[in-house]
Swiss-Prot record:
Origin species: Bordetella avium (strain 197N)
Any one GO MF annotation of this record: structural constituent of ribosome
One GO biological process term: translation
HAMAP family: Ribosomal_uL11 (MF_00736)
Matching PANTHER family: 60S RIBOSOMAL PROTEIN L12, LARGE RIBOSOMAL SUBUNIT PROTEIN UL11M
Protein name: Large ribosomal subunit protein uL11
Organism lineage: Bacteria, Pseudomonadati, Pseudomonadota, Betaproteobacteria, Burkholderiales
Listed SUPFAM superfamilies: Ribosomal L11/L12e N-terminal domain, Ribosomal protein L11, C-terminal domain
Function noted in UniProt: Forms part of the ribosomal stalk which helps the ribosome interact with GTP-bound translation factors.
Keyword flag NADP: no
Coiled coil: none
The family this protein is said to belong to: Belongs to the universal ribosomal protein uL11 family.
PTM comment: One or more lysine residues are methylated.
InterPro entries (UniProt xref): Ribosomal_uL11, Ribosomal_uL11_bac-typ, Ribosomal_uL11_C, Ribosomal_uL11_C_sf, Ribosomal_uL11_CS, Ribosomal_uL11_N, Ribosomal_uL11_N_sf
Pfam family, one: Ribosomal_L11
Length: 143
């Protein structure tokens, strides 16, 4: 028989830097989950990733105080900013441009994000990433 699901917790946790401080501690604590167990498991799974890269995670809490978690791919905006070499997007995205992104960089980001995107193929995923970049005030070349 399957365990009874009590709820889902969605967080963005820096890779390799999960600790019991907020936002992790309070979110897991109010469901009665073992905070340190999650932190150790998450840090072990994100060991090979770039430290500090925000990783969205969905934690499924069960009635017996156990849990499972699923890690998603890093947010597209973070990957776009890193590839374009900018700190933040433009305050006026369609008038002030803050950086440029090549098609090759957009393809690399699309390949990384492919499991979480609803795009049918790589070209559609690249166009999705290009649209996100344009909304941040980043010019996309070759698309």
């Amino acid at each position: 028989m399957a365990k009874k699901i009590v709820g889902f917790i969605k967080l963005q946790v820096p890779a390799g830097k999960a600790n019991p401080s907020p936002p992790i501690g309070p979110a897991l604590g109010q469901r009665g989950l073992n905070i340190m167990e999650f932190c150790k498991a998450f840090n072990a799974k994100t060991q090979g990733m770039e430290p500090g890269l925000p990783i969205p995670v969905v934690i499924t809490a069960f009635a017996d105080k156990s849990f499972t978690f699923i890690m998603k791919t890093p947010p597209a905006t973070v990957l776009i900013k890193k590839a374009a070499g900018v700190q933040k997007g433009s305050p006026k995205p369609h008038t002030d441009k803050v950086g440029t992104l090549t098609r090759a960089q957009a393809e690399e980001i699309a390949k990384t994000k492919q499991p979480d995107l609803t795009a049918a193929d790589l070209d559609a995923a690249v166009r999705t990433i290009a649209g996100s970049a344009r909304s941040m005030g980043i010019t996309v070349e070759g698309i």
